[in-house]
């Protein structure tokens, strides 16, 4: 708990020093979250509804196919931008889903809507 809390606070401080804004939301690594952190830090966890397991493959087509065949309204897609294949897939996913009529919104818009 203490290590996670420190990492979140350090990240918030780094983001605030650049943007002048504090973190409101975060994606917990591995989806592991403890309610106590939410209360202590005033940060809301944002979980995902589609995980194409992009970290297990470099096959862009496989990642794209998994997402676009599963995507439904209000889904949150988990991708890792540290992999070139995931970045390439994300660009294709956005184009395909927009062609299908999907709209991409901020977390604020999704949660408050």
What does each of the following model-derived ranges do?
Residues 1-113:
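Catalytic domains of cell-wall/extracellular-matrix polysaccharide-remodeling enzymes
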